[in-house]
Amino acid sequence: MHLVSVIQRGVWAVLLWPNLLASSVPLDCREEQGILSRCPSISQEKLLDRVIEHAELIYRVSEESCSLYEDMFIPLQFQRNQVGYACITKTLPVPSSKNEIQQISDKWLLHSVLMLVQSWIEPLVYLQTSLDRYNAAPEMLLNKTKWVSEKLISLEQGVVVLIKKMLDEGMLTINHSEQGLLQNGVQPQMLESVMRDYTLLSCFKKDAHKMEAFLKLLKCRQTDRYNCS
Amino acid sequence: GAMMRKVILLLLLLCFTAHTRGKLHSPPAKPGLTSCRSPEKETFTCWWKPGSDGGLPTTHALYYRKESSETVYECPDYHTAGENSCFFNKNDTSIWVNYNITVVATNALGRAFSDPVEIDVVYIVKPNPPEKVTVTVMEDKGWPFLRVSWEPPHKADTRSGWITLIYELRVKLEEEIDWEMHLAGQQKMFNIFSLRSGGKYLVEVRCKPDHGFWSEWSSTSYIKVPDYFHREKSTWILITVFSTFTFLILMWLLHMNRHNLKHCILPPVPGPKIKGFDKQLLKNGKSNQIFSALVVPDFPPATSSNYEDFQVEYLEVYVRREQELVLEESKDLHNSCLKSESSTSDCDSGRGSCDSHTLLMAKCREAKEGERQTDRECSPMRTEAQRRLKDWEEEALNYAHAGIVSLEMSSGRVKTWPSVFSPLPRYSSSPLDQQSSLQMAKQLSLSTSSYLTQPGHSTKEALGQSYWDLCLSSKQPHLLNPPTPVCRELQAHSDVNISSIGHKRAPAGPRSPALHTTEYVEVQRVDNKDTLLLQPVVQGCGRMGGCFQMPHGEVYSKVKGVDSDNVLLLQREGMGEDRCPCVEQETNEVTGSCHKSCTVSTTQKPSGCIYTAVPVRDEMATMANGYVDTATMCTLHTC
């Protein structure tokens, strides 16, 4: 009987041997592998490129939305110039001058980008709701703004991953400052929704451009440290 | 027993295990993840293929893990994408991280894990086919073409640039098998040219993102190209028709003129155009016949206006034997004359023997006799005057001077060297007034010319023979138009090749026929055919006896010979106011001595002194006995 049991176990083992190898072993990732690749993670360069591309897209779409809104709701030029000083993200410790940007480290670049992104998620949602209340808001404008808000969230995720990869930092808690930027940044004279929305759009456009610039600078620094500006 | 039972059990176990795979319940087999696809880079779906379920109801579950995170999530949506699929929506899809996906099959007896798969969403994008593919037929200057337009799949966000798609379309005729592929890039419209008139086309479009897979082909669009006529084709048809007509007309014209063309392109080879030349004779090889056939019957011309002024009497010229023989063969009328004379000719080289006085005399007599015969025979060819001249000649012969070397030639006999003849001096005492000096001269000239123009032709001589009947007769002056005695002095010398005869001066004035038989013929001129035109001279040397004597000098000229240029050299004898030289035969002439220098006179007396230099044939022979000596040559100039 002992032999029989041993034989049985052996037979079972033989029959079930493929299952023993069920757990996969992660293989080394290669850059060029396509579908069903066995790479455990996306490489850093690839990730950075994607983030930059993402940021570019967001900027482009925001620019289109802004110009669309301008043409429709802000006909007079003098009104367009008023929004320059009312951006809600003024208070953020984001470098704004070229000198500052050149001196800042990679880490701070990334953190700045992340701050920007995170600070705009909420306002965009607000903007979306505001635009929905319009009577004559064009469909395209609404779609664009909606798209932008969605992509912004995605961008945030990407930047987080990027930070984790580049800086080997742990998962940063997405700290949405609920300080009510809107409440702080809204000028009293900007109660008019149109102007408010317009301000939001244009400010966001600027910040999106800033994000894109930071990321590109970061990339440039990755390849050639001393020639970037 | 126990051993056998164990063995049996083992065998049974093996059988069961073998059976288990097909029929008995068992844990499920390992499933396999077939593919994961994202249509717009915002969501994606994964499909798996389950293994055998082991006979028991088996459930499958998909678990995924995000990159560098140990948290295992289960598929949020098993139903949206259909059977054995897992759908990841927008919130669950991140382009920043890779996904590690595993499918697990579970049944009552166990579990089965599929091989895990790493997914990068960006690289698994396979868009939907393009939508709203429209094909229209458009026209471009009469040539139709297809315009294909489409839209990207509605899910792909190409507007914002989230996905960049490139398109490709394919076209084929309905009856064809192979497709024609066209890459359209990022544009959403494409033109297709070079269509077949009346053909039915099938068009399909597909797209692909930057990194990803080609989509499926869109649904086929059908289009029929309307029939159109090639404008170019009609032009070509017109051109072809016109050119065919033109070509046919040209061919017809060529056909009508083919003979002319043949003459133009391939001109016929000219044959020999010698009058009387018979090719057949040449082929037969009888040269004699050929040459005889070439004899021009009417040559020298019987009448010539140039000679009308002359009254010519007979001239007798000796001819060489061989020539006589040839002459015999000639078909002319003169042949009869020739033949009659053949016996009397002596054609040895030393013609001088013939020319000796005695011989001449003898010959003259014979000739005279023969002449009579020939006269009779040739009567049709002679005028009465000629006959009379001949009679006179006979008389003259009787009175031949010793000092006179005269060669009397019987009629019909021409004495010639190759193409040279010298007329015999005639002594004629009979008045020759009535002789037609012109006629004589004519005859002389004619015969001369005959010799001259056809050197070596005996026929010529034969021709001349008849004319050369030196039948000067002074007795028949009336026969001659100008009543001038014809003084003819012809020196016929066998040794002398004299192509022309110098002036023959007819002694002026009547002479006693018995004593002065010299007749002078004046060479009127030589025409371009080397014809010596003789004119009986009636002039100052008419003294009967003086013509042949030195005193006649001024009017005489002696044929001295012929120079190398075939020029008849005449020696002017003596002088006289009348500067017509005449050829005189002096018996006392020494060979080679010119009594007088020839007076080259370019002026012509109206009486018709003609100096001619006539080309003489090649042979030169010195004369003997005072005949014209080639050694001393005096050239005469034509008037």
Swiss-Prot record, chain A:
Any Gene Ontology CC annotation: extracellular space
Secretion signal span: 1-24
CDD domains named in the record: somatolactin
InterPro entries on file: 4_helix_cytokine-like_core (IPR009079), Somatotropin/Prolactin (IPR001400), Somatotropin_CS (IPR018116)
Keywords carried by this UniProt record: Disulfide bond, Glycoprotein, Hormone, Secreted, Signal
Cysteine pairs bridged by disulfides in the record: 29-39, 87-203, 220-228
Record's subcellular location: Secreted
UniProt GO molecular function: growth hormone activity; growth hormone receptor binding
Glycosylation sites: 143, 175
One Pfam match: Hormone_1
Gene Ontology biological process terms in this record: animal organ development; growth hormone receptor signaling pathway; positive regulation of growth; positive regulation of receptor signaling pathway via JAK-STAT; response to nutrient levels
Sequence similarity: Belongs to the somatotropin/prolactin family.
Protein name as annotated: Somatolactin
Native species: Cyclopterus lumpus (Lumpsucker)
